[in-house]
């Protein structure tokens, strides 16, 4: 009887092991497919989007000019979420970067105060439990005439600046990660905000 039980346990163990191996192979194949798709979409960006300083990057909802001294980081960028990095970036270390992305929200651009308070509440929830500074919130009008909300803070020693270029029930989210503390990064993100034009 003990021998039959041992056989059954061994068979179950082997079956689980085989299923795990098949599942792992399937996941790897899926990952490879995703990587190939991302590589193809990044190739498309090279041909139709601006990649260097002074060139225009087009989103579905609008466009912005890549700032002087910066370039498109083609490895991480997509048509919906481009990343720009300093031209001097060699591919190693923690790099300052700026991402640009469209998002939706339930607020009209005339109700910017409610939108501002909602963002502030969300940010405070996100940084709770981290070593973070107080959030400095402000607002201004971009050079193109759009209302912009700006939030500055540090999290775990890293300087973060977020801009929201508001429209009716949507916004362009410009996210500055400034690890070096360089003022150039701040100027670059401000340049993106000021050059952005809605379609």
Where are the predicted features?
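N-terminal targeting sequences that direct proteins away from the cytosol to non-cytosolic compartments
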Residues: 2-16, 20-84, 176-199
């Amino acid at each position: 009887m003990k021998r039959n039980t041992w056989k059954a346990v061994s068979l179950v163990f082997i079956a689980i092991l085989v299923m795990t191996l098949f599942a792992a192979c399937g996941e790897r194949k899926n990952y490879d497919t995703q990587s190939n798709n991302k590589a193809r979409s990044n190739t498309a960006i090279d041909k139709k989007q601006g990649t260097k300083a002074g060139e225009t990057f087009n989103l579905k909802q609008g466009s912005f000019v890549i700032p002087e001294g910066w370039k498109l980081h083609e490895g991480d960028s997509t048509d919906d979420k481009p990343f720009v990095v300093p031209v001097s970036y060699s591919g190693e270390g923690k790099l300052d970067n700026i991402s640009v992305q469209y998002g939706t929200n339930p607020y009209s651009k005339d109700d910017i105060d409610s939108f501002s308070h909602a963002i502030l509440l969300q940010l405070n929830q996100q940084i709770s439990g981290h070593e973070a500074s107080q959030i400095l919130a402000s607002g201004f009008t971009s050079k193109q005439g759009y209302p912009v909300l700006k939030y500055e803070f540090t999290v775990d020693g890293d300087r973060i600046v977020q801009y929201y270029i508001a429209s009716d029930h949507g916004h362009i989210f410009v996210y500055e990660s400034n690890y070096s503390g360089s003022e150039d990064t701040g100027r670059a993100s401000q340049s993106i905000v000021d050059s952005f034009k809605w379609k």
